[in-house]
Amino acid sequence: MPEIEIAAGSGDNNDALFGKYELGKLLGCGAFAKVFHARDRRTGQSVAVKILNKKKLLTNPALANNIKREISIMRRLSHPNIVKLHEVMATKSKIFFAMEFVKGGELFNKISKHGRLSEDLSRRYFQQLISAVGYCHARGVYHRDLKPENLLIDENGNLKVSDFGLSALTDQIRPDGLLHTLCGTPAYVAPEILSKKGYEGAKVDVWSCGIVLFVLVAGYLPFNDPNVMNMYKKIYKGEYRFPRWMSPDLKRFVSRLLDINPETRITIDEILKDPWFVRGGFKQIKFHDDEIEDQKVESSLEAVKSLNAFDLISYSSGLDLSGLFAGCSNSSGESERFLSEKSPEMLAEEVEGFAREENLRMKKKKEEEYGFEMEGQNGKFGIGICISRLNDLLVVVEARRRGGDGDCYKEMWNGKLRVQLIRVCDQTSSTNAAI
């Protein structure tokens, strides 16, 4: 197996990744990533380091989007039953995730080795799963790929949800209020996804939770067939059989989870009140921390200071992942980013007005709501502008040279458009921070 290129950071700790993480044994390997056990030199704690080949990702836009989505989602989640993402780092060729190390491994392996679990243990894991899933839903995150392979067990026997690469955010919901992307593993796919008419992420996750619970107690999948189309037919019709050892209460509960009609399928709130679920005592879950979520940041300076590293990483000049996220690289090497308190809409209007005044050819990028490509007469220079919301208070403006003459680019960007945008930002804003 080829060695992973180790990139040391500043300092004398050249035998450690970025001078921070000492890599140990290989935990897993895939087509685009390897996961190593590692030790954090600063704390002595074990971590898992996922290493991805950026070049390979750039040849697979869908996977690159999954990685971007995973960073975006995991940095906003903090829950005892969700794997914690500590840090994201990068070199020119690789991306590194430093994550919580979950010693017990996959729940899937536990079932494969030891067979089905008792109802009591299954209930405990399921309660923790619902705690994590409900927490995600309360924050507009839908996992869409819940299965035992993505559920880990720590040394204390607690469940941890991982792998948010296929997750959806509320801003991916179309005007009809539904998601439309075909995601998930075949045996866990909800029937409404197969209809391709759109679906609600929360209800799809509940279905997958039902499949997981069935597998925990039965030791096998409710819908299984060597022929995938036959399996889909069974899912669509809800054709499955309970094992004889399932209790009547559990059969009733699973039937509500695996209701093929999403409109009548049990909800998270209803799950929390179900007799089978609460048996043995269960602490009521509070999915929203009102004290934290009601706090308001008083100024943009405070907001800049408190920004999570995962918010800034794709804009940082030292660890620039924006080439990966945009699916292309910046061959000219000229780019600049700054923060603004103005709305993306207002800044976009300024950019469009500037293009008209300067007689520049401009087109909007399909993949970005506020992304523009501008080109001077005869192709003398090209500028790419991306305006994206960073959080509730701040917006990032990014400019990149897209070929052409460097002096013309500097004249247009540094001498004109940048000045105009910053002037607009300064009209009512006290803060304008460069990144």
UniProtKB/Swiss-Prot annotation:
The keyword DNA damage does not apply. ATP binds at L27, G28, C29, G30, A31, F32, A33, K34, V35, K50. Pfam families: NAF, Pkinase. Disruption phenotype: Increased proton extrusion and resistance to high external pH. Induction: Up-regulated by salt, drought, abscisic acid and glucose, but not by cold. Residues 302-326 form the NAF domain. Interacts with CBL1, CBL2, CBL3, CBL4/SOS3, and CBL5. CIPK serine-threonine protein kinases interact with CBL proteins. Binding of a CBL protein to the regulatory NAF domain of CIPK protein lead to the activation of the kinase in a calcium-dependent manner. Acts as a negative regulator of the plasma membrane proton pump AHA2 by preventing its interaction with 14-3-3 protein. The activation loop within the kinase domain is the target of phosphorylation/activation by upstream protein kinases. The PPI motif mediates the interaction with the ABI (abscisic acid-insensitive) phosphatases. This is CBL-interacting serine/threonine-protein kinase 11. It comes from Arabidopsis thaliana. The gene is CIPK11.
